[in-house]
Regions:
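Short beta-strand/loop segment that forms part of the nucleotide-sugar
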Residues: 19, 28-38, 55-57
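Conserved short acidic donor-positioning loop in nucleotide-sugar-dependent glycosyltransferases
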Residues: 10, 36-38, 61, 70
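Cell-envelope/extracellular polymer assembly enzymes that use nucleotide-activated donors
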Residues: 1-3, 30
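Residue-level signature of catalytic and energy-coupling elements of molecular machines
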Residues: 22, 70, 89
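Short, well-formed alpha-helical segments that are part of the catalytic scaffolds
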Residues: 10-24
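A conserved acidic beta->alpha catalytic loop
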Residues: 35-43, 90
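Acceptor/aglycone-binding surface of glycosyltransferases and processive sugar-polymer synthases
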Residues: 57-74, 94-132
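Short beta-strand-to-loop acidic/aromatic patch adjacent to the donor-nucleotide binding site
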Residues: 79-91
């Protein structure tokens, strides 16, 4: 089983699309959405979707702590053997996850890091301000 941690902040438009796409591609996944958005709380909507755990944090604590909180919660599920962290804005393409998971499993790896800064990588959906 795969645990996918998605830290979010003001990702109302993407969060549902991304989670549905991931669950369609990966039937053995549990998604942990760690949301720092103060004005929205999607807990009600996500409790209706199987294999999604929504964590709403009251204050914006930052991306790093959102990932750590997600990992802490996900690691309590002993069925999860592989942990993945993805951005909510589709800058990590859901379709590429399978290829990376295959490399991880076939390579008998303990850790696999993908980087958007490799020569063969592309950055999608980023404004010029974010790239700078």
């Amino acid at each position: 089983m795969i645990g996918i941690i998605i830290p979010t902040f003001r990702e109302k438009e993407n969060i549902f699309k991304l989670s549905k796409k991931l669950l369609k591609l990966h039937k053995n996944a549990i998604i942990f959405i760690v949301d720092d958005t103060k004005i929205y709380n999607f807990k009600k909507e996500f409790t209706k979707i199987k294999n999604i755990q929504y964590i709403h944090r009251v204050n914006k604590k930052g991306r790093g702590s959102a990932v750590l909180d997600g990992l802490r919660i996900a690691s309590k599920n002993k069925k999860i053997k592989i942990f993945v962290e993805m951005d909510a804005d589709f800058s990590h393409k859901p379709e590429e996850l399978k290829r990376n998971l295959d490399k991880f499993i076939k390579g008998d790896l303990d850790l696999l890091i993908s980087s958007r800064y490799l020569k063969s990588s592309r950055i999608y959906n980023w404004s010029i301000q974010r790239r700078i």
